[in-house]
Amino acid sequence: MGSVAHLEEVRITVGVDTHRDEHVAVALDALGKKVATTSMPTTPKGYRDLLAWAEGLGAVEGWGVEGTGSYGAGLARHLKSAEHLVHEVIRPNRSVRRRKGKSDLVDAEAAARAVQAGVAAGVPKSGEGAVEMIRVLQIARSSAVKQHTQAINSMRGLIVTAPSELREALRGLSVPRVVAACCLLRPGELATPTAAVKFALRGLARRHRDLTEEIKALDAELAPLTLKAAPRLTRLFGVGIQVAGQLLVTAGDNPSRLHSEESFASLCGVSPVEASSGQTRRHRLNRGGDRQANAALHRIVIVRLRHDEETQRYMAKRTAEGKSKREVIRCLKRYVANEVYAALMTSADNPQKAA
């Protein structure tokens, strides 16, 4: 008769290295011994097969998944829907790769070991609610805004080098008037440089006009989504729809995964990083975090410095103490991050009350 130890179910941890078309998984037992490896396609059936494979090995205590915001997003959602614990894992550091090399199996094993060691404690974004809708619309808007700017810049460049008659007709006009005028150009047969310039300007102007309408349409959808997702956030001084949307995307649909003001500040790159050694106690700037969220906080601070008397008094007080303007702005960004965190938590805990 087998002992009790032999009758106990094996407890395993699974690490997954994610890619566009295939995921590679490694399962470790509770002692860190490699139990099995596999690979599955990134399809719904592949996700089901991977989950069945893991459950067939024993009791799954947790999953370490790389790229839960990109290639691993679909798998993370599937595992969460099956009520499995998923941890977000960053790629192995350079020292690990120097020692063990780089392969999908090595990365998957490192992900599993990160979970067992408690290093991978991050909770992935759920990607299932209004914030995910805001995220995808913001991607489309950012692309449209970039092309919108490129179109008018290209038009200005062409106008500078255009034949004199055409250049003089368009010089000094505002952007809307330049676009309107260029949309009406008639190049005719492309037999001269002037005709070619007119043809190019008309195409760029029409592109600019179409992108303007596209941006307006996206803004019309983003505004109600953002206001509904975090009404208290949009009431903060200096927080507009675009800034609020970016901060929501950074926090995710499940901001409760951020356990404190400090964790949100670190995520936004506004928390100082300790750099002490021996008897020296010092901190350095945080160059990490979500730089788009950091930029959003910066915009809020700049607006408040221009229009909020309390912020202006704080700036005057700290500069009188010897702080530079840049140093004071860093302090203000941290204060704003705390306000944003409180607003996000209120909306997440009780959206009806926040509204």
Identify the role of each PLM range.
Residues 80, 86-126, 132, 182, ...:
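Short alpha-helix plus adjacent loop in nuclease-associated cores
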Residues 59-71:
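Short glycine-rich phosphate-binding loop at a beta-alpha junction
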Residues 21-45:
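Short glycine-rich, Thr/Ser-proximal phosphate-binding strand/loop in the N-terminal lobe
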Residues 2-29, 111, 144, 246:
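Gly/Thr-rich phosphate-binding beta-strand-loop-beta motif of the actin/hexokinase/Hsp70
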Residues 47, 235, 241-325, 353-354:
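Phosphate-backbone recognition surface of nucleic-acid-processing proteins
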Residues 45-62:
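Short, basic/hydrophobic alpha-helical segments
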Residues 137-232:
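Glycine-rich, often acidic, oxyanion-interacting loops/wings at catalytic, nucleic-acid
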